[in-house]
Amino acid sequence: MAATAISSLSFPALGQSDKISNFASSRPLASAIRICTKFSRLSLNSRSTSKSLIHCMSNVTADVPPVSETKSKFLKAYKRPIPSIYNTVLQELIVQQHLMRYKKTYRYDPVFALGFVTVYDQLMEGYPSDQDRDAIFKAYIEALNEDPKQYRIDAQKMEEWARSQTSASLVDFSSKEGDIEAVLKDIAGRAGSKEGFSYSRFFAVGLFRLLELASATDPTVLDKLCASLNINKKSVDRDLDVYRNLLSKLVQAKELLKEYVEREKKKQGERAQSQKANETISKCLGDTLYNPSFLVERKS
């Protein structure tokens, strides 16, 4: 699979509408949800013991909350309605991430964080309100008893590092010193031992984001990076294909939603103009009928 950059998707900003949250399912939307369900079924059976220099923030406690509690925490933290095109996918993601989060083998991974942030930002691009989008992210991560700021911080560190790399230096991390290099070395060691690494589809997206930011367009770079990290390249290829398909379906679904919103706005505008015209006519007729001078016979 060519390691070409995932094209940057630009979903047009959608206007607010009371009916957005009840938008009927379309074929592209239904397909996007099915793909997202497949995408979000993470690898839950592998072990992970993170020793990365970037903060490892989450260890599983003895008391594992049920999925319903995680979903309830999310809904309590963010009480505003979420358009169904976003909400359906978010609900599926949070269920699957809950299952991964509370496995005994789960450890926080900065590359995973980069992948999740990338997927979330692509999914929520074009959301009617930037402030709400950030609030939803905060509520989502905190519902999993993790730190949303740390997700963003680690993702930003990984992105900044990748922008300063070339295809060659990205692959040759093992011969260099630095915080991110230490993270990648740790991943390679754990993945190589097959005892302390938990691969996930978000991890695959995180890897690809590194390639994208390093402008690594040579198809062999991803092969080399996976080999350096002791990651199964076939799994990465498969998961990135699913990710691309998901984004494509989301574009189609959001375009349909945009058209729906524009039609509703147009209808509302037409109704408002019609009502205003009727009010103007009624006012004119009222002024004429109830004007006393109208009842006075004019003299020729």
From Swiss-Prot:
The answer on whether this UniProt entry bears the keyword Transferase reads: no
Annotated protein name in UniProt: Protein THYLAKOID FORMATION 1, chloroplastic
Q: Which family does it belong to?
A: Belongs to the THF1 family.
Q: In which tissues is it expressed?
A: Ubiquitous. Present at higher level in hypocotyls (at protein level). Ubiquitously expressed in all organs, in roots of both light-grown and dark-grown seedlings. Highly expressed in the root apical meristems.
User: Which Gene Ontology terms of cellular component type are present?
Assistant: chloroplast; chloroplast envelope; chloroplast outer membrane; chloroplast stroma; chloroplast thylakoid; chloroplast thylakoid membrane; mitochondrion; plastid inner membrane
The regions listed as transmembrane in this protein's record are: 197-219
Coiled coil residues, start to end: 239-268
On subunit structure and binding partners, the annotation says: Interacts with GPA1.
- UniProt-listed PANTHER family: PROTEIN THYLAKOID FORMATION 1, CHLOROPLASTIC
Please report any disulfide bonds recorded for this protein chain, giving both cysteine positions.
Answer: none
Q: Gene encoding this polypeptide?
A: THF1
Q: Where in the cell is it found?
A: Plastid, Chloroplast outer membrane; Plastid, Chloroplast stroma
- Stretch forming the transit peptide: 1-67
Q: Where is the signal peptide?
A: none
Q: Which residues lie on this side of the membrane: Chloroplast intermembrane?
A: 68-196
Please indicate the ranges of residues that lie on the Cytoplasmic side.
220-300
Source organism per entry reads Arabidopsis thaliana (Mouse-ear cress)
Primary location recorded for the protein, binned into one broad class: plastid
What are the alphabetically sorted keywords of the record?
A: Chloroplast, Coiled coil, Membrane, Plastid, Plastid outer membrane, Transit peptide, Transmembrane, Transmembrane helix
Its annotated function is as follows:
Involved in a dynamic process of vesicle-mediated thylakoid membrane biogenesis. Required for the normal organization of vesicles into mature thylakoid stacks and ultimately for leaf development. Also involved in a sugar-signaling mechanism in roots by mediating signaling between the plasma membrane and the plastid. Probably acts downstream of the plasma membrane-delimited heterotrimeric G-protein GPA1 in a D-glucose signaling pathway.
Q: Which InterPro entries does the record match to this protein?
A: Thf1
Keyword match Transmembrane helix: yes
Membrane topology designation:
Single-pass membrane protein
Q: Which GO terms describe its biological process?
A: chlorophyll catabolic process; defense response to Gram-negative bacterium; G protein-coupled receptor signaling pathway; photosystem II assembly; positive regulation of stomatal opening; protein import into chloroplast stroma; protein import into chloroplast thylakoid membrane; regulation of reactive oxygen species biosynthetic process
Lineage, broadest ranks: Eukaryota, Viridiplantae, Streptophyta, Embryophyta, Tracheophyta
